[in-house]
Amino acid sequence: MKALSKLKAEEGIWMTDVPVPELGHNDLLIKIRKTAICGTDVHIYNWDEWSQKTIPVPMVVGHEYVGEVVGIGQEVKGFKIGDRVSGEGHITCGHCRNCRGGRTHLCRNTIGVGVNRPGCFAEYLVIPAFNAFKIPDNISDDLASIFDPFGNAVHTALSFDLVGEDVLVSGAGPIGIMAAAVAKHVGARNVVITDVNEYRLELARKMGITRAVNVAKENLNDVMAELGMAEGFDIGLEMSGAPPAFRTMLDTMNHGGRIAMLGIPPSDMSIDWTKVIFKGLFIKGIYGREMFETWYKMAALIQSGLDLSPIITHRFSIDDFQKGFDAMRSGQSGKVILSWD
């Protein structure tokens, strides 16, 4: 079968032929329809320090997809041939304390699809049936293919009660924009997103977010005053991993504010901890998606009218995968979809 693989320990990604993966007793064989390029895939393409430490070569990459069930392991129940599915990209062990305690997303033995085991940038994918999620008929293939990053956004945004709150989102990448859209959809009062990338801030404006602020040109305190915010933000969603953005968030949070952190900052990031302590801030780290409550919420949000379509900006045939990666690496894109049909 055709597959996009990391074949060499250098920049790039290559189309190759690999065997169709074998179906285990508890697995599904999925024929891939559409895949989306994640920031992780760009890191792997660029062969940065993280990738060099993490990715075995060769490796079929990719973990954002939608497809059709074409094979079912003999122990599997609840699925049938022809079911349209996406799937959780974190394969968990099932026997650690967190798995057994219902906190599966915190499994200390997690294996990543397209990172530690073959991924979805291929004609076929095998995953444990436990990880598959059936896609409702009224959700398109395009939207289903981005459920993995949408899940990061939903998990982050819904970490706290947002109704009537003022929310600051730092980082207008696709996940940050989707998180801001979720916050607005579920009843936040003001949702402000910050970045320095004007292309992506314009995408955020198309999603109906209260204010998209280019912090290289505007002062966040002026925006807060314009919105009538006298006391600061109630909720912070840190999606950028940029130390200056996080420091600004700490400066502008209200006392007792709550922050969910998905962005990965440098390991040596320094902050003024007195602001955390004297403001009584609560900071929660976010990893992946809650299995599978986040997935049900994703489907329900779309079915209740949340429109994510503006975040998908580019669509290519898999034969034009290089154009897709070029678009993602340029910073002038939202989500990029690759079609395998």
UniProtKB/Swiss-Prot annotation:
The keyword Cytoplasm applies. SUPFAM superfamilies: GroES-like, NAD(P)-binding Rossmann-fold domains. Zn(2+) 1 binds at residues 38, 63-64. Pathway: Amino-acid degradation; L-threonine degradation via oxydo-reductase pathway; glycine from L-threonine: step 1/2. The keyword Oxidoreductase applies. InterPro entries: ADH-like_C, ADH-like_N, ADH_Zn_CS, GroES-like_sf, L-Threonine_3-DHase, NAD(P)-bd_dom_sf, PKS_ER, Zn_alcohol_dh. Binds 2 Zn(2+) ions per subunit. This is L-threonine 3-dehydrogenase. It comes from Shigella sonnei (strain Ss046).
